[in-house]
């Protein structure tokens, strides 16, 4: 239960508190771009991922709502939703280093730098352009849930 509560506090409540604290400063600056870090789990679900998927669906809803609320202001809002990325997430989720590494055997997952490049790209767009939702997956991952992955021998 404590892991579930921590996940919801981090992924939903943490996002709400961050937006509440930071939005006045973004407005005061006269321009801004707010990024939400979502997940493909905010678009689909998978077995054993109910709470995580629910939390990422929550992040997606918060991003969409903020985009509506800021319409007409010079502030862009983008949700970046990565698929399989080789980060510590898998180790935390599985609590086993070998199992975590096994998720990526024979495939090339996203790296944190790939996500950073996507964010940089969105930042560099003309001011009047807003990317609402950016789903980012490696070429080897076809489905949001990882149900279809190309693995090399």
What residue spans do the PLM features occupy?
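Active-site helix of classical SDR
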Residues: 19, 55
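Residue(s) in the substrate-gating loop at a strand-loop-helix junction
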Residues: 39
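Active-site loop immediately N-terminal to the catalytic Tyr-X3-Lys motif
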Residues: 46-50
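Substrate-binding pocket helix/loop in short-chain dehydrogenase/reductase
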Residues: 3-5
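Alpha-helical segment proximal to the catalytic Tyr-Lys
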Residues: 24, 68-71
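A short helix-coil junction within the Rossmann-fold of NAD(P)-dependent oxidoreductases
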Residues: 21-30
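C-terminal helical subdomain
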Residues: 75, 79-83, 98-145
